[in-house]
C-alpha cells in the first residue's frame, strides 16, 4: 500500500426483522471483501436480527477488512422495502455503532431501501388481514 493513499470500502447492511447481513465491498461494489450474517454468530434463529448479533458481525467484518488494508467505510443501510416494511431492523444502528467502535472510519451513511413509486397490491386481500 502506498503512503498517503487510504483504502476505503462500502459496508452494505441489510437489516430486516428476521436477520441482519453485512457485506463489505470495494468502492465500485464489484468485489466482495468480507461478509457476515446473523446465523454465523448466534445459535438461535430468533437472535439473528438482534443488536448483539449485529455488534458481533460488525466486529468480525471490521477485523477482516482491516487485514485487507481498508481504513474507512461508507455505509449503505437497506431494509426489505418494496411491498414489505421500509424501516431497517434492530441490527442496523448497532452494526454502524460497532463498526465505528472497532476503529473503522465512517464516511457517508446512506439509506438505499427500495421504495416503489406505485406500490404493488399488498398481501391480505381486499379487506386486509383480520386479527
Curated annotation (Swiss-Prot):
Parts forming coiled coils: none
Gene Ontology CC annotations of this record: ribonucleoprotein complex; ribosome
GO molecular function: rRNA binding; structural constituent of ribosome
Keywords recorded for this protein, A-Z: Ribonucleoprotein, Ribosomal protein, RNA-binding, rRNA-binding
InterPro entries given in the database record: Ribosomal_uS11, Ribosomal_uS11_archaeal, Ribosomal_uS11_CS, Ribosomal_uS11_sf
Domain of life: Archaea
GO terms for biological process, alphabetical: translation
PANTHER family hit by this protein: 40S RIBOSOMAL PROTEIN S14/30S RIBOSOMAL PROTEIN S11
Function according to Swiss-Prot or TrEMBL: Located on the platform of the 30S subunit.
The protein's assembly and partners: Part of the 30S ribosomal subunit.
HAMAP family, A to Z: Ribosomal_uS11 (MF_01310)
Family: Belongs to the universal ribosomal protein uS11 family.
Protein name from the UniProt record: Small ribosomal subunit protein uS11
Lineage of producing organism: Archaea, Methanobacteriati, Methanobacteriota, Stenosarchaea group, Methanomicrobia
Gene from which the chain derives: rps11
